[in-house]
Swiss-Prot record:
Biased segments, Basic and acidic residues type: 1054-1066
SUPFAM superfamilies assigned to the protein according to its UniProt record, in alphabetical order: EF-hand, Ypt/Rab-GAP domain of gyp1p
Keyword annotations of the record: Cytoplasm, Disease variant, GTPase activation, Repeat
Span of domain GRAM: 145-212, 285-353
Upper taxonomic lineage: Eukaryota, Metazoa, Chordata, Craniata, Vertebrata
Subunit structure: Interacts (via domain Rab-GAP TBC) with RAB11B (in GTP-bound form).
Domain comment quoted from the record: The arginine and glutamine fingers are critical for the GTPase-activating mechanism, they pull out Rab's 'switch 2' glutamine and insert in Rab's active site.
Disease tied to this entry: Nephrotic syndrome 20: A form of nephrotic syndrome, a renal disease clinically characterized by severe proteinuria, resulting in complications such as hypoalbuminemia, hyperlipidemia and edema. Kidney biopsies show non-specific histologic changes such as focal segmental glomerulosclerosis and diffuse mesangial proliferation. Some affected individuals have an inherited steroid-resistant form that progresses to end-stage renal failure. NPHS20 is an X-linked, steroid-resistant form with onset at birth or in the first years of life in affected males.
Protein name from the UniProt record: TBC1 domain family member 8B
GO process annotations (BP): glomerular filtration; vesicle-mediated transport
Tissue specificity comment: Kidney (at protein level).
Job description of the protein: Involved in vesicular recycling, probably as a RAB11B GTPase-activating protein.
Entry GO CC: cytosol
Gene that encodes the chain: TBC1D8B
Domain EF-hand: 858-893
Amino acid sequence: MWLKPEEVLLKNALKLWLMERSNDYFVLQRRRGYGEEGGGGLTGLLVGTLDSVLDSTAKVAPFRILHQTPDSQVYLSIACGANREEITKHWDWLEQNIMKTLSVFDSNEDITNFVQGKIRGLIAEEGKHCFAKEDDPEKFREALLKFEKCFGLPEKEKLVTYYSCSYWKGRVPCQGWLYLSTNFLSFYSFLLGSEIKLIISWDEVSKLEKTSNVILTESIHVCSQGENHYFSMFLHINQTYLLMEQLANYAIRRLFDKETFDNDPVLYNPLQITKRGLENRAHSEQFNAFFRLPKGESLKEVHECFLWVPFSHFNTHGKMCISENYICFASQDGNQCSVIIPLREVLAIDKTNDSSKSVIISIKGKTAFRFHEVKDFEQLVAKLRLRCGAASTQYHDISTELAISSESTEPSDNFEVQSLTSQRECSKTVNTEALMTVFHPQNLETLNSKMLKEKMKEQSWKILFAECGRGVSMFRTKKTRDLVVRGIPETLRGELWMLFSGAVNDMATNPDYYTEVVEQSLGTCNLATEEIERDLRRSLPEHPAFQSDTGISALRRVLTAYAYRNPKIGYCQAMNILTSVLLLYAKEEEAFWLLVAVCERMLPDYFNRRIIGALVDQAVFEELIRDHLPQLTEHMTDMTFFSSVSLSWFLTLFISVLPIESAVNVVDCFFYDGIKAILQLGLAILDYNLDKLLTCKDDAEAVTALNRFFDNVTNKDSPLPSNVQQGSNVSDEKTSHTRVDITDLIRESNEKYGNIRYEDIHSMRCRNRLYVIQTLEETTKQNVLRVVSQDVKLSLQELDELYVIFKKELFLSCYWCLGCPVLKHHDPSLPYLEQYQIDCQQFRALYHLLSPWAHSANKDSLALWTFRLLDENSDCLINFKEFSSAIDIMYNGSFTEKLKLLFKLHIPPAYTEVKSKDASKGDELSKEELLYFSQLHVSKPANEKEAESAKHSPEKGKGKIDIQAYLSQWQDELFKKEENIKDLPRMNQSQFIQFSKTLYNLFHEDPEEESLYQAIAVVTSLLLRMEEVGRKLHSPTSSAKGFSGTVCGSGGPSEEKTGSHLEKDPCSFREEPQWSFAFEQILASLLNEPALVRFFEKPIDVKAKLENARISQLRSRTKM
């Protein structure tokens, strides 16, 4: 590798380097201790340790080339190499391309300048594409060289970054280097002859956290496959931890959670991931989440500055954050002040000429924001003016529409109940009013106490709007939060939900989108629409709005449109309940965008098939309970109770457990504070019921106590009519219990748990996501093992180890082949057995690792035939059940079962003639040849193929599962178990010849090799004579004489001699009658030979084989 020219003092360097070659201008040196017998003794040992500790390139590149000039002790290092061949190439290139040119220069300075320029040019050309995005390309090139030489990971494994740290091996810290790449965490250390190499793939990490104890002040704890690893002594531990967390989550999502990963094109190509890119992505995600911006926004600049707050008459210190389409500000001095300015709202951007370095941003509505002490404010103003010019024509202005619509209380004339025959016409009509406005218009003439309180709330908000502004760019302060906690007025609820959730921005950037999606989704029929239709009448059935076709049609349109927009989610139960509440207070199009905000940004991964997001937040909730309510965790040792109880809280934002008039106040807080509000309220509810819960003897009693509490939560200020309020319908029995006002409960949750920061929740979400997905994977494994264990003799522990190896091989092959198609077949929604399937290439690797017959010379052919036998539905993939059935027979099968397996491998559909194109490789098959032969299948009629495909995968290609098809498949599998040996087809002569060759290969190097050879020769001779006698009645000539003589005369033939005879024989039989054997004939003949019976019934230690396979699975591919 060419190096950036750096000065080296040769006088000191000679103690550590030995001269190999030299000329007038260059010196080739070798590191002391490298390439010497015994490693160079003590000197070599110390040099090696020094190189490792100081991160010297010489550890992995013990050769180097220096540029020298006469009469100077200062030399320049220009190249290094990992081995003699690599450095020799560089030396030869210098002699052929540089040496002749140097003689024309007059001065040594000109020579040095020319060499430096030439080497820098080579480095620039070499790293033009690879290292341009790194902070220090030169150091990164050196680290990459060490990473590649030390670990031998795949060529396309992308090194993201590296850190100096200590790895704790027991109680001893080992100083070394931690390398973080897209798929692996790797560590290398070399101290006084002791070398430590550690490779952990991210898919194995179940726990990643920062810890501290008496010995380690701060360390990073990594748990992988039950083993704990601790790394400490980082220079920037928070930065390191953040990157490790991102890489682990990225790998987990790519391999286990493809539902969300496929929607994330930024991370789809592992080769594009860089340290800087990951850091920028993390900052952008936090920025978007905090300000509720669309997912596509990325943080471009951050400036510390002061913002003038006009209604309070002071400057608040904070950070101005700028993305492509937004300018945002968040205070950092405890004032809880934030501002979001969409560039589409900006009219002018000016700067002041005084020393205040001020930027003034004027927006629609005669509002201006003044930012002081902005660094590089002149450049910033120029950039923002350019962006505003580009942004002004892209958006549809809806902020004024929101304000105007919220003041309108008159019902629309468009809402009439339609008959079933005109339902399609009704579906086309998009509601332009919130359902609450239509079904519960406020009557200003009959003002009761509740209506007066509602009017006072509205007046409070109008005062706030006068001070802080109204619309997207309003100041959001502590006063805003206080008003939200008290409950948003009915008339303003839809508008403020849109603002606080950020849905107003989505709607502005996508004008007419909803109308188009409604039209496109109209009339579609799939699993999602069927489920939607089933749940429409279950959505707030007690509310008049959803007892009429007006509300039902609106709900149908919103849910169907969203399922059409996001087919990865489609429709999930609980979405109907949430959407019903949104439609009560927001227009139909606004309700759609609120649903988008909830499902795609505020509650990510909540509404996919495995509700991973909800499970993650449950784990976060459990962690918060341990921290804030320790006495509860001590009493209820099984934390799964909280998970089961809280699931509906998170999925429906408490709507399913609280009366509707109280639940909407919770939704108010959710749209303002996000998931933080739900977690705080959950803690407050448990805290309020703490004494009751501590006296509960079991989970059922605890659930009853909580349900009774929820029934008694009220909203005394709710203006909803009594026929709509659910809290007013409680029975007399329940009224004896203390009532709790929702406003008081929310206020208490803010006072007690308001110090929980969003950053902490984000960190806990990332940390627990690993645990949740690995737990789901463990559940999948246990279900697979439970099904498979019924059909095999392997113990559960052996099956467990076999499954780990099976799955590991799948992932390793994906790491070594980035475009591996097998990952595309992984679908967590499929039945457990179908989630992980391997192709022929991966099966061959596992066969070589695990099969007791893998020593055979034709092991590739055996692996291929076994794969073809197991691949009954001809999709070139096999699952774990099929794989384990073959392994089980090889290890635990009886003599008859093993022989039957070998027999079936040598007849169709498993058997196909195999011959490598490269004669020098013998029976070894290339990847392409293996793929080709695995796809050669016995031809079947088209209709039979379709029937087979449907039979083996009844759930594929259909909207819903076909129960009849599953029952038919189950019945077929029962028949398969009762398969009679008499049903097996006969084996023809070419297949029998290959069968005989396979047996000879299996017996090779066995302790009883000679007796086995003699026994198989006797059996073969006997079979051929039997066939000859049987055919004499039909043919006067003996077609098998030549073959019989060959085998009988061989006695104990060598493998090579046997192979040559067997290959020649088929040619001599081509024009003669074909002979064949039944399985019973072969079985009876082999049973007569004790040596053969002993060979196949010899016990094999499957545990040792599995242990060895687990260890060597990664080592065989790397330099471990």
